[in-house]
Amino acid sequence: MSQITIALTKGRIEKDTVKLLTQAGFDMSFMADKGRSLIFESPDSRFRFLLVKGPDVTTYVRHGVADLGIVGKDILFEHPTGYLELLDLNFGLCKFSLASVPSYDPHDHKRKRIATKYPTVATDYFNQKGEDVEIISIQGSVEISPVLGLADAIVDIVETGHTLSANGLLVFEDICRVSARLIANQASLKNNPDIMPFVAKIESLVGRREVAFK
């Protein structure tokens, strides 16, 4: 049996993945007391898990260090190449939205400044609308950009909307749905015969979960 290395996004996606794999019948108890460790191997050596930041999941998969990766679709929009996207896992649900202060007019034809941590998503969104905008890349708290006058509006991930409302912002348009995805290294799919049966088992479970959610 060949070991499968899976790169996981630390945090909520990591926790939801552990729940999913437990429901699929895998013993994930070895992940319970992580401490500061970032690499974990299952007792039967079938799996090795790497806990990394979201953008790094695609890097580890692209270079073949990880066979599979579980990461938010928001990351895949910004890093679209070097892997195969296999499954929508139907957790980590949120959305991309256009938000700003209440006085913002989305129909104003002046050239707007848009602050975002996701320049590819923002650029594609405004290109589809036929609007020429200036994209300002922000790595930190993008919500304060319209309040301070740095930008006219923001494009950002929205889960509950609490952070937006706490900073006096409103959602003007929802752009697209975001969820966790299973990605794979193409060479690993070809060379490791244990990957596709594992993927099929997860796909079966995700399909049942999706039906249950409807």
UniProtKB/Swiss-Prot annotation:
Transmembrane segments: none annotated. GO terms for molecular function: ATP binding; ATP phosphoribosyltransferase activity. InterPro entries: ATP_PRibTrfase_cat, ATP_PRibTrfase_CS, ATP_PRibTrfase_HisG, ATP_PRibTrfase_HisG_short. Its main location: cytoplasm. Gene3D superfamilies: Periplasmic binding protein-like II (3.40.190.10). Its EC number is 2.4.2.17. Keywords: Amino-acid biosynthesis, ATP-binding, Cytoplasm, Glycosyltransferase, Histidine biosynthesis, Nucleotide-binding, Transferase. Pathway: Amino-acid biosynthesis; L-histidine biosynthesis; L-histidine from 5-phospho-alpha-D-ribose 1-diphosphate: step 1/9. It holds the Pfam family HisG. Catalyzes the condensation of ATP and 5-phosphoribose 1-diphosphate to form N'-(5'-phosphoribosyl)-ATP (PR-ATP). Has a crucial role in the pathway because the rate of histidine biosynthesis seems to be controlled primarily by regulation of HisG enzymatic activity. Belongs to the ATP phosphoribosyltransferase family. Short subfamily. Heteromultimer composed of HisG and HisZ subunits. This is ATP phosphoribosyltransferase. It comes from Streptococcus sanguinis (strain SK36). The gene is hisG.
